[in-house]
Curated annotation (Swiss-Prot):
InterPro entries associated with the record: RsmH, SAM-dep_MeTrfase_MraW_recog, SAM-dependent_MTases_sf
Name the record gives this protein: Ribosomal RNA small subunit methyltransferase H
Species this chain originates from: Shewanella frigidimarina (strain NCIMB 400)
GO terms under cellular component: cytoplasm
Subcellular location: Cytoplasm
One function term, GO molecular function aspect: rRNA (cytosine-N4-)-methyltransferase activity
Family: Belongs to the methyltransferase superfamily. RsmH family.
Amino acid sequence: MSQEFAHLSVLLNETVDGLNIQSDGIYIDGTFGRGGHSRHVLSHLGENGRLIAIDRDPQAIEAAKQFADDPRFQIVHGGFGQLAEYVEELGLTGKINGVLLDLGVSSPQLDDAERGFSFLRDGPLDMRMDNSQGQTAAQWIARAEIEDMAWVFKTYGEEKNSRHIARCIAADREKTPFLRTKDLADLIARITKNKERNKHPATRVFQAIRIYINSELEQIDQALEGALAVLAPQGRLSVISFHSLEDRMVKRFIRRHSQGESVPHGLPIMEAELNKSRKLKAVSKALKPSDAELELNPRARSSVLRVAERLDY
Protein backbone atom coordinates (compact mmCIF):
# COMPACT_ATOMS: atom_id res chain seq x y z
CA MET A 1 0.00 0.00 0.00
CA SER A 2 1.38 3.44 -0.87
CA GLN A 3 2.37 5.84 1.87
CA GLU A 4 -0.18 8.31 0.51
CA PHE A 5 -3.04 6.00 1.35
CA ALA A 6 -1.58 4.61 4.60
CA HIS A 7 -4.08 4.35 7.42
CA LEU A 8 -3.47 4.75 11.15
CA SER A 9 -6.11 2.98 13.20
CA VAL A 10 -7.59 5.34 15.78
CA LEU A 11 -7.58 4.43 19.50
CA LEU A 12 -6.07 1.09 18.52
CA ASN A 13 -4.99 -0.22 21.92
CA GLU A 14 -7.96 1.22 23.81
CA THR A 15 -10.49 -0.26 21.39
CA VAL A 16 -9.01 -3.75 21.37
CA ASP A 17 -8.35 -3.68 25.12
CA GLY A 18 -12.02 -2.81 25.56
CA LEU A 19 -12.95 -6.14 23.96
CA ASN A 20 -11.23 -7.98 26.83
CA ILE A 21 -10.12 -10.62 24.33
CA GLN A 22 -10.14 -14.31 25.19
CA SER A 23 -7.54 -16.29 23.26
CA ASP A 24 -10.12 -18.79 21.99
CA GLY A 25 -12.94 -16.28 21.50
CA ILE A 26 -14.90 -15.31 18.39
CA TYR A 27 -14.79 -11.65 17.39
CA ILE A 28 -16.20 -9.36 14.72
CA ASP A 29 -14.47 -6.38 13.15
CA GLY A 30 -17.48 -4.75 11.52
CA THR A 31 -15.39 -2.10 9.76
CA PHE A 32 -12.26 -3.81 8.42
CA GLY A 33 -10.93 -0.81 6.48
CA ARG A 34 -7.26 -1.57 5.93
CA GLY A 35 -7.00 -4.12 8.72
CA GLY A 36 -5.33 -2.20 11.54
CA HIS A 37 -7.78 -3.21 14.25
CA SER A 38 -8.11 -6.73 12.83
CA ARG A 39 -4.35 -7.22 12.94
CA HIS A 40 -4.28 -6.16 16.59
CA VAL A 41 -7.19 -8.46 17.48
CA LEU A 42 -5.48 -11.40 15.76
CA SER A 43 -2.31 -10.73 17.75
CA HIS A 44 -4.32 -11.39 20.94
CA LEU A 45 -6.01 -14.58 19.68
CA GLY A 46 -4.69 -18.10 20.10
CA GLU A 47 -4.83 -20.76 17.39
CA ASN A 48 -8.45 -21.59 18.28
CA GLY A 49 -9.61 -17.98 18.18
CA ARG A 50 -11.60 -16.58 15.29
CA LEU A 51 -12.10 -13.16 13.68
CA ILE A 52 -14.86 -12.33 11.21
CA ALA A 53 -14.28 -9.02 9.41
CA ILE A 54 -16.88 -7.08 7.43
CA ASP A 55 -16.57 -4.22 4.93
CA ARG A 56 -18.55 -2.97 1.95
CA ASP A 57 -15.61 -1.20 0.30
CA PRO A 58 -14.14 -3.36 -2.50
CA GLN A 59 -10.70 -1.89 -1.79
CA ALA A 60 -10.97 -3.09 1.82
CA ILE A 61 -11.82 -6.58 0.58
CA GLU A 62 -8.69 -6.45 -1.56
CA ALA A 63 -6.63 -5.31 1.45
CA ALA A 64 -7.95 -8.28 3.45
CA LYS A 65 -5.86 -10.60 1.28
CA GLN A 66 -2.98 -9.80 3.64
CA PHE A 67 -4.60 -12.26 6.07
CA ALA A 68 -5.47 -14.91 3.48
CA ASP A 69 -3.09 -17.44 5.02
CA ASP A 70 -4.45 -17.03 8.55
CA PRO A 71 -7.08 -19.75 9.20
CA ARG A 72 -8.51 -17.73 12.10
CA PHE A 73 -9.59 -14.91 9.77
CA GLN A 74 -12.41 -14.50 7.27
CA ILE A 75 -13.74 -11.45 5.43
CA VAL A 76 -17.34 -10.73 4.43
CA HIS A 77 -18.13 -8.22 1.66
CA GLY A 78 -21.12 -6.25 2.90
CA GLY A 79 -22.34 -3.53 5.22
CA PHE A 80 -21.93 -3.84 8.97
CA GLY A 81 -25.64 -3.16 9.33
CA GLN A 82 -26.19 -6.76 8.25
CA LEU A 83 -23.73 -8.28 10.73
CA ALA A 84 -26.48 -10.16 12.60
CA GLU A 85 -27.49 -11.85 9.33
CA TYR A 86 -23.92 -12.88 8.54
CA VAL A 87 -23.45 -14.27 12.06
CA GLU A 88 -26.73 -16.18 11.85
CA GLU A 89 -25.66 -17.74 8.55
CA LEU A 90 -22.51 -18.96 10.30
CA GLY A 91 -24.55 -20.41 13.17
CA LEU A 92 -22.82 -18.19 15.72
CA THR A 93 -25.65 -16.06 17.11
CA GLY A 94 -25.17 -15.63 20.86
CA LYS A 95 -21.60 -16.95 20.65
CA ILE A 96 -19.72 -13.77 19.69
CA ASN A 97 -17.31 -12.56 22.37
CA GLY A 98 -16.78 -9.09 20.98
CA VAL A 99 -17.83 -6.66 18.24
CA LEU A 100 -15.68 -3.75 17.09
CA LEU A 101 -17.06 -0.86 15.03
CA ASP A 102 -14.91 2.00 13.73
CA LEU A 103 -17.48 4.35 12.23
CA GLY A 104 -17.12 6.90 9.47
CA VAL A 105 -14.81 7.21 6.49
CA SER A 106 -11.23 5.89 6.54
CA SER A 107 -8.07 7.84 5.71
CA PRO A 108 -7.44 5.88 2.48
CA GLN A 109 -10.95 6.74 1.32
CA LEU A 110 -10.41 10.42 2.11
CA ASP A 111 -6.95 10.53 0.58
CA ASP A 112 -7.92 8.83 -2.68
CA ALA A 113 -9.32 11.67 -4.78
CA GLU A 114 -11.03 9.18 -7.10
CA ARG A 115 -13.38 8.13 -4.27
CA GLY A 116 -14.84 11.64 -4.10
CA PHE A 117 -15.05 11.95 -0.32
CA SER A 118 -12.71 14.90 0.19
CA PHE A 119 -13.31 18.59 -0.43
CA LEU A 120 -9.53 19.09 -0.31
CA ARG A 121 -8.73 16.79 -3.25
CA ASP A 122 -10.35 17.22 -6.63
CA GLY A 123 -12.00 14.08 -7.93
CA PRO A 124 -15.30 12.71 -9.23
CA LEU A 125 -18.19 13.54 -6.91
CA ASP A 126 -18.87 9.94 -5.87
CA MET A 127 -18.79 9.32 -2.07
CA ARG A 128 -20.07 5.73 -2.19
CA MET A 129 -18.50 3.36 0.33
CA ASP A 130 -19.18 0.57 -2.16
CA ASN A 131 -18.52 2.18 -5.51
CA SER A 132 -19.92 -0.80 -7.38
CA GLN A 133 -23.54 0.03 -6.58
CA GLY A 134 -25.96 2.82 -5.66
CA GLN A 135 -26.24 6.43 -6.80
CA THR A 136 -23.27 8.77 -6.64
CA ALA A 137 -23.27 12.11 -4.87
CA ALA A 138 -23.22 13.82 -8.27
CA GLN A 139 -26.33 11.93 -9.39
CA TRP A 140 -28.19 12.83 -6.21
CA ILE A 141 -27.24 16.52 -6.38
CA ALA A 142 -28.34 16.66 -10.02
CA ARG A 143 -31.94 15.71 -9.24
CA ALA A 144 -32.60 16.40 -5.55
CA GLU A 145 -35.25 19.00 -4.68
CA ILE A 146 -34.08 22.09 -2.80
CA GLU A 147 -36.09 21.09 0.27
CA ASP A 148 -34.56 17.62 0.25
CA MET A 149 -31.02 18.95 -0.03
CA ALA A 150 -31.62 21.46 2.77
CA TRP A 151 -33.01 18.69 5.00
CA VAL A 152 -30.01 16.44 4.36
CA PHE A 153 -27.50 19.23 5.02
CA LYS A 154 -29.21 20.23 8.27
CA THR A 155 -30.04 16.74 9.55
CA TYR A 156 -26.83 14.93 8.71
CA GLY A 157 -24.37 17.84 8.68
CA GLU A 158 -25.92 20.16 11.27
CA GLU A 159 -25.34 22.89 8.71
CA LYS A 160 -26.90 26.22 9.77
CA ASN A 161 -26.97 27.62 6.23
CA SER A 162 -28.55 24.50 4.75
CA ARG A 163 -31.35 26.22 2.85
CA HIS A 164 -29.12 28.94 1.38
CA ILE A 165 -26.55 26.38 0.22
CA ALA A 166 -29.27 24.17 -1.28
CA ARG A 167 -30.73 27.08 -3.24
CA CYS A 168 -27.31 28.08 -4.58
CA ILE A 169 -26.55 24.51 -5.65
CA ALA A 170 -29.90 24.27 -7.45
CA ALA A 171 -29.29 27.56 -9.25
CA ASP A 172 -25.75 26.67 -10.33
CA ARG A 173 -26.56 23.15 -11.51
CA GLU A 174 -28.88 24.64 -14.12
CA LYS A 175 -25.80 26.11 -15.79
CA THR A 176 -23.24 23.38 -15.16
CA PRO A 177 -23.75 20.03 -13.40
CA PHE A 178 -21.67 19.31 -10.29
CA LEU A 179 -19.42 16.45 -11.32
CA ARG A 180 -16.24 17.18 -9.34
CA THR A 181 -15.62 17.60 -5.61
CA LYS A 182 -13.77 20.87 -6.22
CA ASP A 183 -16.75 22.38 -8.02
CA LEU A 184 -19.04 21.78 -5.05
CA ALA A 185 -16.46 22.75 -2.42
CA ASP A 186 -15.60 25.98 -4.25
CA LEU A 187 -19.26 26.99 -4.53
CA ILE A 188 -19.87 26.46 -0.81
CA ALA A 189 -16.71 28.38 0.10
CA ARG A 190 -17.74 31.24 -2.17
CA ILE A 191 -21.27 31.65 -0.76
CA THR A 192 -20.44 31.12 2.92
CA LYS A 193 -20.09 34.45 4.74
CA ASN A 194 -19.46 33.51 8.37
CA LYS A 195 -16.73 30.90 8.10
CA GLU A 196 -15.81 28.72 11.09
CA ARG A 197 -12.22 28.99 12.25
CA ASN A 198 -10.01 26.05 11.23
CA LYS A 199 -12.89 24.37 9.37
CA HIS A 200 -13.48 24.34 5.63
CA PRO A 201 -16.94 25.75 4.79
CA ALA A 202 -17.80 22.55 2.88
CA THR A 203 -17.04 20.20 5.80
CA ARG A 204 -20.60 19.82 7.04
CA VAL A 205 -22.20 19.54 3.61
CA PHE A 206 -19.75 16.87 2.45
CA GLN A 207 -20.34 14.93 5.68
CA ALA A 208 -24.10 15.19 5.20
CA ILE A 209 -24.04 14.00 1.59
CA ARG A 210 -21.74 11.08 2.46
CA ILE A 211 -23.97 9.98 5.33
CA TYR A 212 -27.07 10.21 3.15
CA ILE A 213 -25.60 8.45 0.09
CA ASN A 214 -24.39 5.54 2.22
CA SER A 215 -27.35 5.38 4.64
CA GLU A 216 -24.73 5.53 7.39
CA LEU A 217 -26.98 6.27 10.37
CA GLU A 218 -29.40 3.50 9.41
CA GLN A 219 -26.44 1.15 9.08
CA ILE A 220 -25.17 2.17 12.51
CA ASP A 221 -28.56 1.60 14.12
CA GLN A 222 -28.82 -1.85 12.53
CA ALA A 223 -25.24 -2.69 13.50
CA LEU A 224 -25.76 -1.77 17.16
CA GLU A 225 -28.95 -3.81 17.40
CA GLY A 226 -27.24 -6.63 15.51
CA ALA A 227 -24.28 -6.61 17.88
CA LEU A 228 -26.61 -6.87 20.85
CA ALA A 229 -28.34 -9.84 19.23
CA VAL A 230 -25.17 -11.81 18.49
CA LEU A 231 -23.08 -11.16 21.62
CA ALA A 232 -22.59 -13.89 24.19
CA PRO A 233 -23.03 -13.00 27.89
CA GLN A 234 -20.04 -10.86 28.97
CA GLY A 235 -19.31 -10.17 25.30
CA ARG A 236 -18.00 -6.68 24.61
CA LEU A 237 -18.99 -3.94 22.16
CA SER A 238 -16.31 -1.34 21.28
CA VAL A 239 -17.46 1.55 19.09
CA ILE A 240 -15.43 4.50 17.77
CA SER A 241 -17.43 7.54 16.62
CA PHE A 242 -16.13 10.57 14.74
CA HIS A 243 -18.90 13.15 14.95
CA SER A 244 -21.73 14.10 17.29
CA LEU A 245 -24.49 12.35 15.32
CA GLU A 246 -22.72 9.00 15.56
CA ASP A 247 -21.67 9.41 19.17
CA ARG A 248 -25.18 10.41 20.29
CA MET A 249 -26.57 7.27 18.67
CA VAL A 250 -24.03 5.04 20.42
CA LYS A 251 -24.40 6.80 23.77
CA ARG A 252 -28.20 6.59 23.71
CA PHE A 253 -28.13 2.96 22.60
CA ILE A 254 -25.91 1.92 25.50
CA ARG A 255 -27.89 4.02 27.97
CA ARG A 256 -31.23 2.62 26.80
CA HIS A 257 -30.15 -0.98 27.13
CA SER A 258 -28.35 -0.31 30.42
CA GLN A 259 -31.45 1.14 32.07
CA GLY A 260 -33.82 -1.59 30.97
CA GLU A 261 -37.52 -1.23 30.30
CA SER A 262 -39.32 1.78 31.74
CA VAL A 263 -41.91 0.93 34.39
CA PRO A 264 -44.93 3.16 35.20
CA HIS A 265 -44.56 4.89 38.55
CA GLY A 266 -46.19 2.98 41.38
CA LEU A 267 -46.31 -0.34 39.57
CA PRO A 268 -44.90 -3.02 41.91
CA ILE A 269 -42.02 -4.89 40.29
CA MET A 270 -39.15 -6.90 41.70
CA GLU A 271 -35.60 -5.68 41.08
CA ALA A 272 -34.76 -9.08 39.60
CA GLU A 273 -37.50 -8.67 37.01
CA LEU A 274 -36.25 -5.22 36.10
CA ASN A 275 -32.69 -6.50 35.77
CA LYS A 276 -33.81 -9.05 33.18
CA SER A 277 -34.61 -6.22 30.79
CA ARG A 278 -31.14 -4.71 31.17
CA LYS A 279 -29.02 -6.02 28.33
CA LEU A 280 -25.86 -3.91 28.54
CA LYS A 281 -23.65 -2.11 30.97
CA ALA A 282 -21.17 0.63 30.14
CA VAL A 283 -17.66 -0.58 30.88
CA SER A 284 -16.01 2.83 31.17
CA LYS A 285 -16.52 6.49 30.43
CA ALA A 286 -16.08 7.67 26.87
CA LEU A 287 -12.40 7.69 25.89
CA LYS A 288 -10.62 10.25 23.72
CA PRO A 289 -7.22 9.95 22.01
CA SER A 290 -4.13 10.85 24.01
CA ASP A 291 -2.02 13.89 23.15
CA ALA A 292 0.64 11.52 21.87
CA GLU A 293 -1.80 9.89 19.43
CA LEU A 294 -3.11 13.26 18.25
CA GLU A 295 0.42 14.40 17.51
CA LEU A 296 0.95 11.29 15.39
CA ASN A 297 -2.53 11.31 13.82
CA PRO A 298 -4.38 14.68 13.89
CA ARG A 299 -7.40 13.09 12.19
CA ALA A 300 -8.13 11.27 15.45
CA ARG A 301 -9.01 14.53 17.21
CA SER A 302 -12.79 14.10 17.02
CA SER A 303 -12.89 10.37 17.79
CA VAL A 304 -14.69 8.96 20.84
CA LEU A 305 -14.61 5.36 22.07
CA ARG A 306 -17.47 3.81 24.04
CA VAL A 307 -17.38 0.24 25.39
CA ALA A 308 -20.27 -1.83 26.74
CA GLU A 309 -20.67 -5.39 27.99
CA ARG A 310 -23.53 -7.82 27.27
CA LEU A 311 -25.28 -8.89 30.45
CA ASP A 312 -26.55 -12.42 31.12
CA TYR A 313 -29.85 -13.32 29.51
